[in-house]
Amino acid sequence: MAKSSFKLDHTLERRQAEANRIREKYSDRIPVIVEKAERSDIPDIDKKKYLVPADLTVGQFVYVVRKRIKLSPEKAIFIFVKNTLPPTAALMSAIYEENKDEDGFLYMTYSGENTFGLL
């Protein structure tokens, strides 16, 4: 997997400081970075950084991402954490605890494909 552009744009120290500040100020929220997968034909997302409620499910977060990229109903979207599809019913807090980066952020990648094969 290619290195996150967020990681390339910000030093580890800066990312750690920001994640720590966020977690101290909003202990019931999770700092998430969402980026489009390389070579995906799905639209770009308007913002990459999200402060997600800990009790939100992965499925609910997918809905948020879908709305942000204004994805048409016939298109599927897939969210990956470390190149793996997390269970839709899993809580974001559980995914965060298992997969957070050394900088304190949870990195998610999204990709899509046309589920109906329209020509």
From Swiss-Prot:
Residues bearing a lipid moiety (Phosphatidylethanolamine amidated glycine): 117
Annotated site location: Cleavage: 117-118
Gene Ontology MF, one: phosphatidylethanolamine binding
Keywords tagged on the record: Autophagy, Cytoplasm, Cytoplasmic vesicle, Cytoskeleton, Lipoprotein, Membrane, Microtubule, Protein transport, Transport, Ubl conjugation pathway, Vacuole
Gene designation per UniProt: ATG8B
Post-translational modification: The C-terminal 2 residues are removed by ATG4 to expose Gly-117 at the C-terminus. The C-terminal Gly is then amidated with phosphatidylethanolamine by an activating system similar to that for ubiquitin.
Lineage: superkingdom: Eukaryota
Protein family: Belongs to the ATG8 family.
Name of protein: Autophagy-related protein 8B
Subunit composition and interactions: Interacts with ATG4.
GO cellular component, one term: autophagosome membrane
Membrane topology label: Lipid-anchor
Lineage: Eukaryota, Viridiplantae, Streptophyta, Embryophyta, Tracheophyta
Removed propeptide positions: 118-119
InterPro entries: Atg8-like, Ubiquitin-like_domsf
Keyword set includes Hydrolase: no
Annotated function: Ubiquitin-like modifier involved in autophagosomes formation. May mediate the delivery of the autophagosomes to the vacuole via the microtubule cytoskeleton.
Main location: membrane
Cell compartments where the protein resides: Cytoplasmic vesicle, Autophagosome membrane; Vacuole membrane; Cytoplasm, Cytoskeleton
UniProt record, GO biological process: autophagosome assembly; autophagosome maturation; cellular response to nitrogen starvation; mitophagy; protein transport
